[in-house]
């Protein structure tokens, strides 16, 4: 079986191999985060027929927002990538375990912008939904921003904090970039996706060459690097599997259409290891939700939904996990809700006086 890294790409770079973080980080949550696995040979079950969960099905919501499916039908390169994915169920399963943490948030952000919900699956292709994934070209995070593109979209990068790993910030930056590319290429999402992988300059030059030769200038007719030739069909193929799993002999483990995490505003930095002991949430889970924190959350904290409710009911828990801190020139610590329009709602928890 191919190493997982061979499936993954980076935003605006052409390095196919990734150095993936410790896969054991997902082990405690394997059963609850599995999403795509081979269907039983004697039956094929679609998500709507599985045990009902409050909030409805996120898969059903995603399908309602799919708008690129017409571009997937009868395309040989998409069919090839679909078979390629189906031959690698371990990738689909491992990717989905992590993706279940983030998909509801990403879908919500896409809905706000009226963007195709197939794009919610892009981190599966970019990073396997691993926020710690890093390429040899230094692309980082769920959305695989290289340093220059991260700076272009105001993602902070310093020694103790790299916002390319931050789930909300990197997601919004990625959608900003995709929206820009969509406009740049006159509303063509396939060209926008190709440019997300290869850079708009490379795609623009390929269009210019074809136009000069009297050739078609759509994505399928452009001469692009091999990685980019596979990148867009692979996303479309994955969306086919999600859109019609029964047609392809896979089953989707249920994901409820409800937030997986809640954002909590912090007045002081919090030690994740200490908070894990106090809250009962596994430290690895806190680190996967707060990968930019590097063990110390500042400003805001992402917590699994049920754990955040317990936290709000016991605000002294934050105080016990708080670290002594003096704001430096690069940050300002406040006890105010995040104003970035985050989904789900941000809750404010201030540390008790004297902590």
Task: Label each PLM-derived region with a short phrase.
Residues 82-94, 129-136, 144-172, 176-187, ...:
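Substrate-binding clefts and substrate-entry loops adjacent to catalytic sites
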Residues 115-131, 192-198, 286-289:
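Short, functionally critical alpha-helical segments immediately adjacent to catalytic or ligand/cofactor-binding
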Residues 18-50, 310-355:
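Compositionally biased, proline/threonine/alanine/serine-rich low-complexity intrinsically disordered stretches
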Residues 9-114:
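An acidic, Gly/Ser/Thr/Pro-rich helix-cap/linker signature
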Residues 289-324:
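Extracellular LysM carbohydrate-binding repeats and other cell-envelope/extracellular binding modules
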Residues 179-206, 274:
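Catalytic and binding regions of secreted/periplasmic enzymes and modules that target cell-wall glycans
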Residues 253-283, 331-338, 344, 349-355:
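Primarily a LysM-type cell-wall glycan-binding module
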Residues 1-9:
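Bacterial N-terminal signal peptides
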